[in-house]
C-alpha cells in the first residue's frame, strides 16, 4: 500500500543529455520559470482502492506510464489484488533526467514476489527507455 495519501512529482535533473534534447519542448514553460522549480502536492488514490471501489474482479492488462512513478504505483497494489491482474505493461526510463529514487530491479523484485515475470522488453526509439510486459504466472 502507498506510504501516504499524497505524493510529489519528481525533480528534473537539468544537467542530463536527455534534458538538453528535450529543452526545446520544455522551453515552452520558460515564461514561468517558477513552474519548473516548485513542488506541487497531488492527492493520490492507490490502485487497490480503485479495484475495491469499482468491484473489479479481473484485469487483463494494467498499463502504467507515469513518467518515473511506476514503482510507487505498483506499491499501491495490495498483494491480494495482484492475483486479479493477468499482465502489467510498464515503461521505464534509464536516463537520469527524472530523479526516481528506485531502480528497475526494485520493480522486478516487487513483481516477482507477486508471481509476475518479464515476458517482453521493447526499446523505445530515440530514448533510453524500454517498455516491459510482465505476466502473472498464476493466471
Model-based region annotation:
Residues 48-139:
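Conserved acidic-Pro-Pro-aromatic motif
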Residues 1-45:
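Glycine-rich adenosyl-binding loop in Rossmann-like folds that engage adenosine-containing cofactors
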